[in-house]
Swiss-Prot record:
Protein name in the entry: Elongation factor Ts, mitochondrial
GO BP of this protein: mitochondrial translational elongation
Keyword check for Protein biosynthesis: yes
Keywords of this entry: Elongation factor, Mitochondrion, Protein biosynthesis
């Protein structure tokens, strides 16, 4: 009886010790798990990569979130370049025209993808912005101190050499986006214009993307360089001229005294003015005291054209 009592007492005390130890282990483990989950959520939010890849990155980098983010970008870039080479031959005729007008300078770009679904994706639209602002930065750097009119057309090869920052190239960003979206994407062309004092830049985008505040995007775009116009009405004049160029698709400028050739007219100035077909573009400009000097029109996916005339 005495021995039985002793064994029971030992067993009871041992159970208490195990229970306390287990509870302490759980208590000390909770903060660690919570911290790891918080890191995982933060990395997922900042990069947009899957939870599985984010978890793998944190494990490889000993929960160093900065190193994990760099590792994820490196892997995505490698996968993007690989996927880009595989998708290169696929037809990409959808996409967006991006247009930004700054102080005496403007840029218009075309970025193509395979489907309208991807064109509506935020990551694709961010790429359009990256291309436009990189092109504008290139224009500003190249034309410092320029006092006259400057116009530059950039093809895909020129654009691929541009940088987004000190450590990022446009070509790498393109590969990264292809890897994320899984479609063939191409940065097709861009145009920049810079104007001197007294000149103005009108613009218009058709089929616009909602929710864009820092630049305009759509299926069609136009830039119009003009002089003159009435004070307080320059923005309206520029927008109407851009709207006409998008809608009527002129291929050359023409002269103010050219006679119109009807519906087949391809010269801008003798065309019937789209917002008011009762007069020609030349007649409208005369009434406004203005003169068009140049224009560029982009249509997303159009064949064999750089938009110049």
């Amino acid at each position: 009886m005495a021995l039985t009592y002793v064994f029971r007492s030992i067993r009871t005390e041992f159970s208490k010790v195990c229970t306390v130890h287990h509870a302490q282990s759980l208590h000390t483990g909770f903060p660690t798990l919570a911290a790891e989950k918080a890191l995982l959520m933060k990395l997922r939010k900042s990069t947009g990569y899957t939870f599985i890849n984010c978890k793998k990155a944190l494990e490889k980098c000993d929960n160093d979130i900065t190193k994990a983010e760099s590792w994820l970008h490196e892997q995505a870039q490698k996968e993007g370049w690989s996927k880009a080479s595989k998708l290169e031959g696929r037809r990409a005729k959808e996409g967006l025209i991006g247009l930004f007008v700054g102080d005496k300078a403007a840029v218009m770009v075309e970025v193509n993808c395979e489907t309208d679904f991807v064109a509506r994706n935020e990551k694709f639209q961010q790429l359009v912005k990256d291309v436009a602002f990189a092109t504008m930065a290139h224009h500003s750097s190249k034309n410092q101190g320029q006092t006259g009119y400057v116009k530059s057309l950039l093809a895909a090869e020129d654009l691929s050499k541009l940088n987004l920052g000190e450590d990022a190239s446009l070509a790498d960003q393109l590969a990264l986006t292809i890897g994320r979206l899984g479609e063939n994407i191409s940065v097709r062309r861009a145009v920049t214009v810079g104007v001197p004092a007294g000149w103005h830049i009108g613009s218009y985008i058709h089929g616009g993307v909602a929710g864009q505040s820092d630049m305009a995007m759509g299926r069609y775009g136009a830039l119009v360089v003009f002089q003159g116009g009435k004070d307080g009405a320059l923005d309206t004049l520029g927008r109407k001229l851009g709207q006409h160029v998008v809608g009527e698709a002129p291929v050359s400028l023409g002269n103010m005294d050219d006679l119109p050739c009807g519906d087949a007219e391809t010269r801008l100035l003798p065309q019937s003015f789209l917002p008011d077909p009762s007069r020609t573009v030349a007649q409208y400009l005369t009434e406004q005291g203005a003169r068009v000097l140049d224009f560029v029109r982009f249509q997303c996916g159009e064949a064999g054209s750089d938009g110049a005339h």
